[in-house]
Amino acid sequence: LNKPLLNDNEYDQLKEDILFLEKKYDFLASENSPSKIVGFKPSKTFKKVFHRVPMLSLSNAFDEEDLVNFEKKINNFLDQKSSNEYEYSAEPKIDGISASLVFKKGKFIMGLSRGDGKEGEDITQNLMTIDDIPKKITAKNFPDEIDIRGEIFIQNKDFENLKDKFANPRNAASGSLRQKNPQDTKKIPLKFIAYTFGYVNKMEVKNQSDYLQQLSEWGFKTNPFNKTIKGIKNL
């Protein structure tokens, strides 16, 4: 039934504890540490394909102090003493499965799972069944080559009919994308929201907010609650 022993919050907190200990006692770090693993090993059921640009995961922030420290890192990177005028593109995190959609000449030709971040599973045929994913884009400003990245998920209201098979919507989305028969995947009400990109040969956008707007114009669904916010404390 794909039932995890820990919920996401418990897992994230344990991972944070491990990262803290490794930072303090570096000799504790091992190759199997969560700090060195992104996602999961690709399944043997599907063909493995390397991402043209690594598909990394996001770090967690558990409280306001974590956010302030994040902004301090930005200041240090930019060699700034202090500032609360940075603009942040923010949107709620969708609890689903990350996917990378490869487009060439406007045509969706391949879809990959995150896998371990470097190498993903070729789940193209299953992704083809999702209505939210455009299969052909004719916009003149659409790049010749681009990897559109986003989240595959199941809405809570649609999960009601799947409770007997899966522990939660995220596991349902994951299991559905790993079906051997795409017709079985098609029966599941999967959704897709785009939010970033991997490889792109050429694209003219100034910032993340502009990119999200461009995605909408190309026909991709984006998070309706995304906002541009000034200052980390206004998040």
PLM segments and residue spans:
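RNA/tRNA-interacting regions in translation and RNA-turnover enzymes
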Residues: 1-235
